[in-house]
Amino acid sequence: SKFQIYNSLFLTLPFENIKETSLFLPLFVETCKKGYEDNNKPIDIVTSFFERYAPDFDEEKQKDLLFNFIQYIERQVVLFDAIEDASFSYVNNMHGRGTLRNIKEEAANKQLSETLSEYIKRFNVRIVLTAHPTQFYPDNVLVIINELSNAIAKDDLDSIKKLLVQLGKTPFYKKEKPTPFDEAVSLIWFLENVFYHSASTIYDYVAEHIINSDELDNSIFDFGFWPGGDRDGNPFVTAKITLKTAKRLQFSVLRNYYRDLRKLKRKITFPGAEHRVANLEQLVFNELFYPDRNTEFSLDILLNEMNTVLDILINEHSGLYQEDVRNIIHKMKLFGLHFASLDIRQDSRVHHGVFTEIVSHPDIQSYVTGLPENYLDLTAEKRLEALSTMKGNVSPTIYGDEITQQTLESIRAMQSIQKTNGERGSNRYIISNCQTLENILELFAMCRLSNWENPTVDFIPLFETIPDLESAEAVMEGLFNNPIYKAHLESRKNKQTVMLGFSDGTKDGGYFMANWSIYKAKEALSGLATKYGISMAFFDGRGGPPARGGGNTHEFYASMGDTIQSDDIQLTIQGQTISSNFGTLDSSQYNLEQLLSSGIASRILNPGKNNLSDADRKTMENIAVHSYEAYQNFKAHPMFIPYLERMSTLPFYAKTNIGSRPSKRGKSKGLQFEDLRAIPFVGSWSQLKQNVPGFFGVGTSIQHFINEGKIEYVKQLYKNSRFFRTLLFNSMMSLTKSFFKLTAYMKEDKEFGAFWELIFEEYKL
C-alpha cells in the first residue's frame, strides 16, 4: 500500500534515534496488545516492556524512547491522513448516491425535474465554522497535510520526502493558547482555499444543469463564522476583535476576487470587454491596499460590471470564456464582500446582568424613551411590554462594568460591519441558554437602545437542555404574539431561526433523549410557525462525534419527516470536522453536495416516507424515557464527577492550548457538572475509549422492551423509521469506537471498580 511505501521513508529521515524507535515500536505494540488481553495496568505494561527488551535503559532513556514513540506515531497518523485525503475521489463516488448529479437523474426519472428546480430556488444550506477546541493539529501541521496530500496525489516522491522531513522538525504542541483572532485566521484559510472553490463549483453545476443561471437568485450556500464573534464563555472576544475579524474576512474574499480577475484579464483580450475587466481588477486592488482611494465601491458595482462583461461576451464574441465570467459572478453572489457572516453569541444570563446594569444607571432616562422608572420592580408581564417599546441611544462609555461595555460595543460593531461588509457581514445574534421570552426581548431591547430602532438582525434563541427544548414552543409563541417583534419579523421576510444544541442536550439528557427532544421541538415549532404564517429555520449546533450531534450528518437530515419545516439546513462545523470533512476540494465538494441533496431527497423525492406513525411515535417516546432515566441515574452516581476528574484526561484539557476560551464555564474551584463544557466532557470519555455520552441508556432502554416482551415494537420502529435507524447507527459508531480492554484494569480499583463495571455492563447491552 501507499502507506507502507511512504512510511518506509521514515527510516531514511535524518532524525536522532529514528532506527531505534522504529525497531522498538512494533515490540511495544505487541506488548501492549498482550497486556490489554491480560487486563494489566498501563504502568505494568510499560514496565514489562522495558524489563524484557531494554533492561539497560535508565529512567531518562525510557522516557526519551516513549516520547520518540509518540512523535513517530503522530507523524504516521499525519501521513495516513494525507494519503486518505489524496485518494478521496477514488474511495468515494463523486457522482454516486447523494450527489447532485444523482439527485438530478433521480428527479428526471420520477418526472420531478421542475419541482426540483423550484425547490432549489429557495432551499439553502448554511455552514457555520466555529472555533470549538477539537482541532489538535497546529495550523502549520494542517498546511503540511494539505501539501503532502497534493504531493501523494502526484506521486511526487522528492516532495513527499522533503515534507516528511519538515513534518519531523515541526512541533505538534502549541506553547501558547491561540487568541480569538488566531482562531479566525486559521479558519479563514479554509474559506479562502477550499470553500471558495468547492461551493462555487456546485453553484456552477446547479446554474448550468438544473436552473437557468439568470433565474437563480438563491445563494444555495451561506457561510457563517463564529471565531471573533462567539462570546459565550470566552472573555477574550471583544468588539475590537470582532471588527478586526470582519476586516480580515473582507480582505480575504477581495484577495480571491483579485486573483480571479487577474486570471480573467489574461483571457479577455478583445474590444469592449478588455478594459472593463482591467478596471475591475484595479478597483478591487485599490480596495484591498488603498481603500481610501475608492470613492465608490460596493458589491452591486462589481456584479453590474461583471454582468455587463458577460453580455458583451455573449452578444459580440460568441460567448467565449463566458463560463469563467459566470464562475466569478457566482462567487460574488455566494460570498459578497463579507466572505462569511460573523455571528455574535452570548449567554442569556450575561445579557440579563448587562440589561439590569443598563437600566440601573442613574441617568438612564436621559438616553432612552419607553423605560418605566420602576422597571426592575415590575411584574414579568409588564417588563415584557416595556422591553418591546423602549428605544434610545445609550453609549457604552457611560458604564464602568467591562462586560456591559463590551456587550453594547458588540452591538455597535454589528452596525459598523454591516456598513462595510454589507448586511450579511454580521446580522445574526444567538442567545445561548435561552429559557424564557424575556431572554430574547432583553437583547431586542438592547439593540434598540443602541441607536438601532429597526435592527437588521436575526435574533436566534438557542435551546439546549431537555426542559428548555420542551418549553421552546411556549417561548416562541409568546414572541410571535408580540406586535413589535412581529413587525420586526415582517422586515426579516417573516423568517425566524431557532438554534438547537445537540452537545449540551446530550450532556444534560443523554444521547437518545436529546435527539428525540430536538426532533419533537422541531415538529412543535414547525407547527407553530405554520400557524402564524412564518418560515422557520433550524440551526443545529452539532459537533463531530455522535455524542455531540455528529456521526452521519447527511443521513440525519435525509431522515426528517414532513412535520418539520426544512427549506434550510443550518449547522455548525467544528474543529477537526472542518479539516477531515472539508479539508480538500474533493472532500468539501462531496460533503457539501451530500448535505444539499439530503434536504432535497426527503422533501422532493420521498415526501411523507419519513413520517412517524402514532404507534412508532409511542415506541420512540418510551425508548427515550427509559434511556433518560438510566442516564440521569448514572449522572447522579456519587463517583460520576470523581471518576472524570481522577481517571480521565479531563483535568488536562485546559493545558492543551488548542482553544482560546477557558475549559469550564464557572469560576468555582471544584468541578461542577453545570460548569462542564460539552467538548472536554465528551472528549474525556472518548480518550478513555468508553464514549459513554454516545450510547449510555440506549441499551438499557431496549433491554426493557425485551424484558417486557415488547421487542417487536422496537423492530417495527426500526423497519419503519429512517430517523430511528440513523440514531442507532450513530450510537453503534460510538460503541464500535469504544475499547474497554484499555481500561479493564480499573475493574480492580477499590474506589472506582464498581463504577467502571456499571459503564461496561451498559456497553455490553
Predicted regions and their residues:
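Catalytic or ion-translocation cores adjacent to nucleophile or general acid/base/metal-coordination motifs
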Residues: 239-265, 450-626
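Conserved structured core elements
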Residues: 157, 185, 189, 193-196, ...
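Generic, well-ordered alpha-helical scaffold segments in large soluble proteins
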Residues: 9, 194, 198-205, 209, ...
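Conserved mid-sequence domains
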Residues: 356-466, 470-471, 484-485
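Glycine- and acidic
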Residues: 172-189, 239, 291-293, 308-315, ...
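Conserved alpha/beta core surface patches that mediate binding of polyanionic ligands
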Residues: 208-223, 409, 440-445, 474-486, ...
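Often metal-dependent polyanion-binding catalytic scaffolds in large enzymes
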Residues: 1-383, 403-406, 427, 457, ...
